[in-house]
Amino acid sequence: MRYISTRGQAPALNFEDVLLAGLASDGGLYVPENLPRFTLEEIASWVGLPYHELAFRVMRPFVAGSIADADFKKILEETYGVFAHDAVAPLRQLNGNEWVLELFHGPTLAFKDFALQLLGRLLDHVLAKRGERVVIMGATSGDTGSAAIEGCRRCDNVDIFIMHPHNRVSEVQRRQMTTILGDNIHNIAIEGNFDDCQEMVKASFADQGFLKGTRLVAVNSINWARIMAQIVYYFHAALQLGAPHRSVAFSVPTGNFGDIFAGYLARNMGLPVSQLIVATNRNDILHRFMSGNRYDKDTLHPSLSPSMDIMVSSNFERLLFDLHGRNGKAVAELLDAFKASGKLSVEDQRWTEARKLFDSLAVSDEQTCETIAEVYRSSGELLDPHTAIGVRAARECRRSLSVPMVTLGTAHPVKFPEAVEKAGIGQAPALPAHLADLFEREERCTVLPNELAKVQAFVSQHGNRGKPL
């Protein structure tokens, strides 16, 4: 499998190189040159497979030529063997034809475990084969950091440095990062805000000289391997609800468009998906595009669903590439204009093509709390705020009551106690058994000033274990 850039000017790469590259050299994002397509007979034969076996069948074409089948099977078995539920991603019925796909049974209780548990193991495998070692730098406001650290904690060839704003993440989120103790794990609390952390990561990627030749790798949602891993659970859910002989619809809480783009790819690979709903909060750049062909940058508004608090959606470029007939030059020109003006729209026929599959809804904090309370009263299920937004969008935007509607349950409610408390249900979520002692565990974290030079000196000093810098 070869991968090409959405902007058309970077060389095509194989899976190994894409895994390590993150962004393409022309600033674009990598996508498969040719998307595999499965027949209905193939998809039907996967009914009842354990999650890791289904994952092998769905993802095998993407790693072909880079990872041997036996190695990939072993990696997948290890990846999904650490999840706390036997089904890995169980379906929970809310009522009638309405379902929640629980994606929070991984080590850090968020959907990001599906991709980052795999990404860490893939990196370690590829680096061992190459005899290389890399440094991962990332910034987090909570969930991504803990999932990335948990995914890389046993990697022999990776040193990971995650920055979070000092005293600005919840105690649960902080402890999920700082209680993972390993020689290759480095938590840095920056005396600043999340944007300060993000800017330091960007500056480090732009000028990697401080690492003296060691490669810096990104694990955020632009990395193709994360999108690839998320395709699987769309097949997993749909197969339990009658696919491929029956269509299924999905409502997806999304800010960066990565999770829902995986559903779009699943459909293009042969899964009968009749509708994809973009469910978002008041930071609604995706809703404004889907509802009115206006992708305009706006002010950031903090919300009860912080994982969707974004101004620009980093994976939206991958959809634009397809809407423009995979014309990288057209996408590059469009995004250059967006960078200059903060505004983007596409030709009417391209937007109409997107609307054949996509619907969207922006949900306020008040509506989010209403939905948490309503679902709890009617079904006994306690939702996190992101999942509640997905359920609200599913109920308001679904096109057919006869088609199963699946909302992606993106996080465990224990991660967002403020939203649950504001919903007024009088029920506080409890930590799962494997995290019951979280508040007693030893923490390890380094507090650093908001100064790039001091952060880079720390990374240079502690990174690349076992090899001179």
Curated annotation (Swiss-Prot):
Keywords: Amino-acid biosynthesis, Lyase, Pyridoxal phosphate, Threonine biosynthesis. InterPro entries: Ser/Thr_deHydtase_PyrdxlP-BS (IPR000634), Thr_synth_N (IPR029144), Thr_synth_N_sf (IPR037158), Thr_synthase-like (IPR004450), Threonine_Synthase (IPR051166), TrpB-like_PALP (IPR001926), TrpB-like_PALP_sf (IPR036052). GO terms for biological process: threonine biosynthetic process. Catalyzes the gamma-elimination of phosphate from L-phosphohomoserine and the beta-addition of water to produce L-threonine. GO terms for molecular function: pyridoxal phosphate binding; threonine synthase activity. The gene is thrC. Pathway: Amino-acid biosynthesis; L-threonine biosynthesis; L-threonine from L-aspartate: step 5/5. NCBIfam families: thrC (TIGR00260). It catalyses: O-phospho-L-homoserine + H2O = L-threonine + phosphate. It comes from Pseudomonas aeruginosa (strain ATCC 15692 / DSM 22644 / CIP 104116 / JCM 14847 / LMG 12228 / 1C / PRS 101 / PAO1). Its cofactor is pyridoxal 5'-phosphate. Belongs to the threonine synthase family. Pfam families: PALP (PF00291), THR4_C (PF24857), Thr_synth_N (PF14821). This is Threonine synthase. Transmembrane segments: none annotated. The modification N6-(pyridoxal phosphate)lysine is found at K112. Its EC number is 4.2.3.1. It comes from the Bacteria.
